[in-house]
Amino acid sequence: MGLLLKIVQIAKNIIPVPPIGYGGTERDIHYLTNCLIDRGHEVIVFAKQGSKCKGKLIPYPKNSSKNLLPFVKKNLPDGVDVIIDHAGFVAMAKLPIPTLCSIHSAYTMNVQFPVYVSKFLLEQQGNGKGYFVHNGIGVEDYPYIEKKENFLLSLGRIIPSKGTHFAIKAAKGTGDSLIIAGNVPKKGIAYFNKEVKPHIDGEQIKYIGEVGGEEKMELLSKAKCVLFPITWGEPFGLVPIEAMACGTPVIAFRKGGVLETMNGFPELTCNNLNVMVTILQRNHFPSPNRLRQYVIQHFSAEVMTNNFEKLIHKAIKEYKK
């Protein structure tokens, strides 16, 4: 098992851990905390009020999102061996404790031990300096269904970079029905009204809003295929992993972290709408079991924790030099 440690995880004060709907980073913190505790480590989590975790939870003050550093310093337990900061403000403060900064987005931070969520982000944002650990999920939480229903699924925030309009065009190109599930943030309202809403007919193209919990799992596990036609270099992209954990195939545009998450199934990636339609029409996908096993082997919470543990020990060793 190795040396047992006292580990602090730092979340942002925006979304609770674990999240109800949107919140990939918070889901990572949830799974990483559980796995570290299962391995005998002591884990303390600073997170938004309303969060729930297997370890000790230290909730941030209510309605406070700025300058949380004094609160963390004041409430930091004695004897902490290492900090994993998913928010950035603790790592940038350079406290006298080994600190890994888990970087989930294309945001530049001056930290000593950066850990990016993908090799793509490490190279693009970190210029190759630092490390990367892929996100992982608790595959056992995702229902596995072999017999799929006859609908396509577009899951995620409805903004131009997620390519919801391409999912609509792909469905119209094949005649398949499409369910669009996701929230429309402020920056996506104009896009939704122009590119998405006019196509919603309640029959072939349905929009059901943001989903979470059992409803999200049911959609992911029953969909014939999940479409992920992103138009930007997304750092990681959790939806393909979640879908494949349910045994559901994904067709994705070759952008950003998709080249890593879909590395085992290059035949399901493409560069444009026409090829996406062709793949759908071909209707030849890997077996549901093969998709799920791929996630277990490469993107499970256990694999993520293995990789974090290696970097934790490396960070502690380097700090002591």
Where are these regions (language model features)?
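Conserved donor-binding/catalytic core segment of Leloir-type glycosyltransferases
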Residues: 128-181
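Nucleotide-activated donor-binding/catalytic signature segment of Leloir-type glycosyltransferases, i.e.
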Residues: 193-211
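Short hydrophobic beta-strand element within catalytic cores of glycosyltransferases
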Residues: 249-252
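Conserved acidic donor-binding segment of nucleotide-sugar-dependent glycosyltransferases
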Residues: 263-274, 280-285
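A short, well-ordered alpha-helix in the C-terminal region of glycosyltransferases
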Residues: 285-301, 307-310, 314
